């Protein structure tokens, strides 16, 4: 059988497994790839391949993550699984694997545990929009009432963190049985049901080109006789020659017009998400624009300096700080293309933050940055990364 060409016709969705240690995340990931590859072609990854996940670096932090892919009738899925609990936290905070939805794996034998709770809270904080539940190890429970209790507990826990507990699909099965080829309800068919739940419950994400135009400014030049050119990689949306744009962040917001788009020394009518371009601006002086600002569709993004964040602080072994920090710690916050100094307020009852900890904090920047909930940043001291974070809520 010849290999099928990877088709771009199906919408692409990013998912991942989360949940307490030893509840079966990696076994489930292996089972999905096995059953979907048998049904639709694709590559089966066994448990060992996934568990020996390669280390990656994201914003200066080393994270072990396994990436697998599979297809359903309707979609192409990219799925991440992390071997260690710390890897999950780093992964979710750095956005190394941005998820359109998460599969939370909960052992029916234990019910929700400490890390289950922590992962649901983090999903909320970092903006994972949808959760589907796989209640695993069904072959080890024969008490129907116990299963109902666990299900109730899961729905209440989801409600507690503002996920719709009553509407969340909960699939009951055994990832191990499915992997072994068991044909019963809790075996292979539970995996088919799970993938169907992903197809129907997680909406197709908006493509980057459908979002409002946004380009972080990396560099500014002036070209005599033509005006000012700003360069950068377009993060979202499309810009057309003739568009009115805003320059947002650091200083007061200014309005300008795009009079040209250039890529690889060629003039274009437009630039879109993913392109590295130079944008020629009319009526904007070279000294009015700087790296760290963004070029955006008017009204689509505002500058802010106060926010609540979920942060991971690197351990000493990861090249982070060797000592804890205290309230009013003032590092640099690196947003998109630039560093801005900010002051940190720790939560009540938290005296200090140790290297290797994750913490929720309030931050006030010295100058405003174009920002919205979900924006990622690095925390740096003198150019060295000491932490990573995500804006969970803009507060000004």
UniProtKB/Swiss-Prot annotation:
Binding site for GTP: 19-26, 81-85, 136-139
Entry's Gene Ontology cellular component terms: cytoplasm
Region (G4): 136-139
UniProt EC number: 3.6.5.3
Class in the EC hierarchy, top level: hydrolase
Domain tr-type G: 10-206
Principal cellular location given in the protein's record: cytoplasm
Binding-site residues for Mg(2+), renumbered to this chain: 26
Region span, G1: 19-26
Renumbered residue ranges of the record's region G2: 60-64
Molecular-function GO term, any one: guanosine tetraphosphate binding
G5: annotated span: 174-176
Keywords per UniProt: Cytoplasm, Elongation factor, GTP-binding, Hydrolase, Magnesium, Metal-binding, Nucleotide-binding, Protein biosynthesis
Subunit structure, interactors included: Monomer.
Family, as annotated: Belongs to the TRAFAC class translation factor GTPase superfamily. Classic translation factor GTPase family. EF-Tu/EF-1A subfamily.
Annotated protein name in UniProt: Elongation factor Tu 1
Organism: Ruthia magnifica subsp. Calyptogena magnifica
Gene name as annotated: tuf1
């Amino acid at each position: 059988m010849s290999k099928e060409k990877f088709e771009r016709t199906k919408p692409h969705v990013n998912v991942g497994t989360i949940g307490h240690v030893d509840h079966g995340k990696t076994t489930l990931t292996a089972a999905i790839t096995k059953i979907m590859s048998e049904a639709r072609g694709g590559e089966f990854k066994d448990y060992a391949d996934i568990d020996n996940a390669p280390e990656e670096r994201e914003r200066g932090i080393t994270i072990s993550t396994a990436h697998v892919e599979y297809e359903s009738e309707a979609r192409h899925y990219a799925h991440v699984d992390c071997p260690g609990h710390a890897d999950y936290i780093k992964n979710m905070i750095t956005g190394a694997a941005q998820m359109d939805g998460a599969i939370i794996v909960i052992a029916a034998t234990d019910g929700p545990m400490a890390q289950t709770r922590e992962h649901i809270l983090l999903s909320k904080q970092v903006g994972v929009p949808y959760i589907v539940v796989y209640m695993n190890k069904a072959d080890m429970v024969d008490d129907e009432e116990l299963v109902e209790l666990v299900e109730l507990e899961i729905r209440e826990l989801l409600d507690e963190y503002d996920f719709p507990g009553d509407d969340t699909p909960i699939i009951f099965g055994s990832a191990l049985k499915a992997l072994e080829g068991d044909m019963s309800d809790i075996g292979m068919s539970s995996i088919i049901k799970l993938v169907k739940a992903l197809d129907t419950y997680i909406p197709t994400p908006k493509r980057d080109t459908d979002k409002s135009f946004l380009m972080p400014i990396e560099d500014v030049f002036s070209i005599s006789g033509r005006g000012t050119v700003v360069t950068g990689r377009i993060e979202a949306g499309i810009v057309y020659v003739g568009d009115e744009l805003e320059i947002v962040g650091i200083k007061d917001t200014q309005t300008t017009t795009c009079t040209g788009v250039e890529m690889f020394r060629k003039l274009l009518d437009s630039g879109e998400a993913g392109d590295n371009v130079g944008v020629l601006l009319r009526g904007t002086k070279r000294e009015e624009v700087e790296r760290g600002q963004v070029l955006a569709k008017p009204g689509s993004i505002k500058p802010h300096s106060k926010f609540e964040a979920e942060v991971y602080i690197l351990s000493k072994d990861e090249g982070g700080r060797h000592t804890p920090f205290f309230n009013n710690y003032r590092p640099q916050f690196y947003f998109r293309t630039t560093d801005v100094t900010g002051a940190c307020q720790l939560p009540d009852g938290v005296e200090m933050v140790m290297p290797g900890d994750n913490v929720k904090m309030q931050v006030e920047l010295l100058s405003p940055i174009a920002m919205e909930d979900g924006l990622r940043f690095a925390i740096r001291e003198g150019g060295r990364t000491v932490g990573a974070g995500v804006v969970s809520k803009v507060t000004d």
